[in-house]
Each structure stands twice: as C-alpha cells, then as structure tokens.
Amino acid sequence: MHRYRTHTCGALRPSDVGQTVRLSGWCHRIRDHGGVLFIDLRDHYGLTQCVIDSDSPAFKAAETARSEWVIRIDGRVRTRPAGTENAELPTGSVEVYIDDLEVLGPAGELPLPVFGDQEYPEETRLKYRFLDLRREKLHANIMKRGAIIDSLRRRMREGGFFEFQTPILTASSPEGARDYLVPSRVHPGKFYALPQAPQQFKQLTMIAGFDRYFQIAPCFRDEDARADRSPGEFYQLDIEMSFVTQEDVFQAVEPVLRGVFEEFANGKRVTKEFPRITYADAMLKYGVDKPDLRNPLIIADVTDEFADDAVEFKAFKGVIKSGGVVRAIPATGAAGQPRSFFDKLNDWARSEGAPGLGYIVFEEEGGALTGKGPIAKFIPPEIQARIAQKAGAKAGDAVFFAAGTEAKAAALAGKARIRIGDELKLSDTDQFAFCWVVDFPMYEWNEEDKKIDFSHNPFSMPNYDRDAFLALGEEDAEKILGIKAFQYDIVCNGIELSSGAIRNHRPDVMEKAFAIAGYGRDVLEEKFGGMLNALRLGAPPHGGIAPGVDRIVMLLCEEPNIREVVLFPMNQRAEDLMMGAPAEATPKQLRELHIRLNLPEKKG
C-alpha cells in the first residue's frame, strides 16, 4: 500500500464498497456525535466522509484531531446509512470507517477558517493566502484559471501560432507607466527594467522573420491597483502576426476568445460574430470607448432639436451656444416609475458634478405621443416627437438628457445609460457580449499646450495614404485631426480586454507621425533608436494584440475583483503581506550594488 494514499478524497464510489483504502488530507470539518466522530477529509480532488467510534483502536488519536490538521487514515469503504447520503458530493453515497489514523501535520489556531463562507478583511486573507486558497470557491477559481490558460495555448497553437519566451530583464522604455528597476551588480550605476509588456521584443520577433508569435506573458507596471487590474504584475495573451491587415488579426483572435468563453461560460451565451463599432459611434451611442452591449439602451444626439428656435429651454440653449451638445438617454418602460425614481437619478447626476438630468416622460393621449415632465413645457410637441424618434422612445418610456461639452456630455450620458439600465434591470446579464472598437483618432488637439498631440498609440499605422501623409504640413491641421489609426480594442461586457494595432513599420512614416506631434527625430532616436534601427533593415507589415489573461479569468469566474483569480496577489499598495515584500535590502547587498539610500523624511 502506498505510504500516503490509495485513492484521493474525491475518488470513492459505491463500486469501492468493501475495499480497504488509505486516504490523506485535511480535516475539513469534525463532528462529535457522542462516541462517534465524523471527519470530513479534504484534499485537492474532493471530500470524503470518514467515521470512527470508540471500538476503533484509532479513536483516541482521532479525538486529538482539529480543523485543518493533515492526517492519514486507513479504513473500509461502506455505504452510508439510508437518509444520510449527500447528493451534492460525488462521494456522498459512501463513507470510510477508520481503522488506523496518523497525524501528518498538526495545525495551530487558525487566523482564517477554511470551512464556511465568512468574509474576512483583505489584510488577513492576503497574509494567510495559503489558508484562503484552501477555500472551495477560491481553489476552484485558480484551477479554472489554469484550465483557461491551457485552452488559450491550445487554441493559439491550432491557429498556427508558435509560443516564444522574451526577456524578463530588459531596458527601460517609456510606455506610460513607471518601470520596476533592477540594479546591476556587474555594471555599477546601471539598471535593468522588468518589461511593462513584451511590445518591442514581439515586434523584433516579426522583424527576425518569424510569422505568428504568442506568449502568456508576465508584465510589470508600477501603477496603482484597480478592481480589474492587479498591482505590480499581470499576465496577457501576447500576440503578433506578420503580413496582416487589421481584419486578419480579428479573424485570428475571434475564434480563440469565442472558443474559450464558450468552453467556460457555464451556459451563458457568447457573441458569435463580434460587431465592429467605430470609436466615434461608441462615444456617441454608449458614452464610452468600451461599451457594455448587454445594456440595450443607445444614446442619441439631440443638439439640433434643442437648438431649434421654437424650444425655450434656456439651460440647454446656453450650453449649445457655448459649443456644447445635448445627448438623450432612453429609459425603456420608465413612465410607470414613481417620482422618486427620477429624483434619485437627478441626485446621482448632481453627485457626478452635473446640475442634474432633465427628462421627458412619454405617454399616449388621444392616439398621439405626449411628453410630460419638468422640461416638456419648454418644448413644442413636434420637437418632442423628433426627440422621441431619435431616442427610440415610445409611449411608456422616458428620455433623460445630458448637456455640456462633447466630452462631458458623453461621459455623463454613458454613466447614466449604465445607471438607468441597472435601475430598470434592462441588461441581459446571461451573456458575454463582445465587440471591436475601431477607427481611433490618430491625433487630438491639446488645448492646454495649444498643439496637436497623439490621441492613443503613437506606434500604430495611420489609416491614410502614405505619400499624402508624408506631405502634410502645419496648414493641414484639420486633415491631421481627422486621421484615423489602425488601432483597435476588444471589449467584453464593458471591460476592455486589450488594445491592439497594426504597427507603424515604416521609419519615414514614424518620423513624420512624431514630427506632427512636435517630437524631433533626435527624441525618436534617443528613446526608440533600437527599434528604429531594426525597422530600417527590412521590417514586414505586422500587427497584434494582447488580451489580459487576468481579466478573461475574472469574467469567466464572475468575480468583481481580480484578486479572486490570482494565486498570490499583492494588496492595493503593492505589498505582499505573506512574504513581506517589498523589504529593506541588507547593507551588504546595497554595497555590492553600489547603492546609497536617500530616503524621504518620515512625516509626523
């Protein structure tokens, strides 16, 4: 017989009745029924009920066992008495009568109970993460994460991609966030950086002549934590392809994501064909560049309607005269809501810094659509009808309004759309709704510096005739601000899984792109000289994307916080409470690295 087990704690079935078995695991729960002890023994694979009474020679040893002690038991498998079966357990129709018991690992007083679903402070959970991970739900999340990553890898290989590994110690690059720096002992005063992403390496892999790259890549960024972003490090499905258009990238990525989500969706529907939504349409219709398509409400622009001379609502008139816009957010079926519903939404809008949300409630009177509400009296019936038509409203619906600069109106309308959809329970949450957001602007006007600046990714290829782009001058500001980039985002349920782009592989186009934004060739050479040199030596057209693995797992595990799908996460301050990181270096380590500390004075 094996030293520790003949079966796992999830393996025994009625066909095993009568066998002598050996199990090892943790005491999940112990129940004392007056001379009879029931021990639920748990391991990675499941849970088995074990029974011992005073007739067993191992009874005294069993009486000493406590929760989370690790024990080994020998015993006979028997059928549970009628009426005591547990249909929720695969092993629930059998139990093991204990003949022998050995304590393999006793446990002290637990700072965090494993049995039950009690909520404990984040600090306690992270400090004793190894205990937290014994809990069924979190344990299942981590196993599901591994299965999802296996599925991603398999689907990428089936799509003709090859897995590469890129360096972890590399050079610092200005990619938006702060780098984590690693001092070099061999080169005093010099530092490596942990990669914020393998961006340059994956492009260099294409320039090196490889065709389809992928990697489950660790990325390191010294930035603040969010619910959907783990501090310090995260993983992404890094993808790059040569000789491809934007549509080729979409066709390669969609089957992978759709397949993985269908595999792990627990019966939820998954978008079959991912719709393409332009950035301009996303900002107009949804108020954000990462729309949640589970919500059916679509925002409409009604600036022209409120600008009509027949409209007497001065608040919106003033906004429009100042160059602002008015957006309409439909609220399906809201006409039947009490006044408190509308007051509550106005209070919410004021908490967002807006004066409120004007609204019209549409009802049918005498066969005609009639608007009621605080601002309806300022708007003639024919204009009300136009507003209802644009907003897709009918009798029984309401329409709310957000006014301000284009950016502020879009932001408020986007938040109001989500809020209204949630309040009225309009969203179809039984699905994973994907979309691509495309046609991002290449440039935008920087009002503060009075100059043209990059809007998003400066290294994406402009969607513009190359010769015409190279010929653009200062007098072509309007044309420049209208240029779109071959840049795209993949969004699921309102969460951005990734940005991607067709890369700017032409040095002449890249130099021009940076010159338009006010960056000289010297700046480009200084910051990205290595990449430019590679591009000058025969670079193929290439593009890619990098969906976030942690966010994918978070969605599929239906967890609101990324911490619940990461094995050993840091806290919000990027501290590992379990291992005590970051920690002070010893004087010897600092001397070897030629580092002298200049710490800020402690406050107070």
UniProtKB/Swiss-Prot annotation:
Q: Which GO terms describe its cellular component?
A: cytoplasm
- Single Gene Ontology MF annotation: aspartate-tRNA ligase activity
Question: At which positions is L-aspartate bound?
Answer: E175, R221, H456, R503
SUPFAM superfamilies named among the record's database cross-references: Class II aaRS and biotin synthetases (SSF55681), GAD domain-like (SSF55261), Nucleic acid-binding proteins (SSF50249)
Per UniProt, subcellular location reads as: Cytoplasm
What reaction(s) does this enzyme catalyze? tRNA(Asx) + L-aspartate + ATP = L-aspartyl-tRNA(Asx) + AMP + diphosphate
Origin: domain of life = Bacteria
Annotated keywords: Aminoacyl-tRNA synthetase, ATP-binding, Cytoplasm, Ligase, Nucleotide-binding, Protein biosynthesis
Site annotation Important for tRNA non-discrimination: residues: H33, G83
Similarity field: Belongs to the class-II aminoacyl-tRNA synthetase family. Type 1 subfamily.
Q: What is this protein called?
A: Aspartate--tRNA(Asp/Asn) ligase
Name the gene behind this protein. Answer: aspS
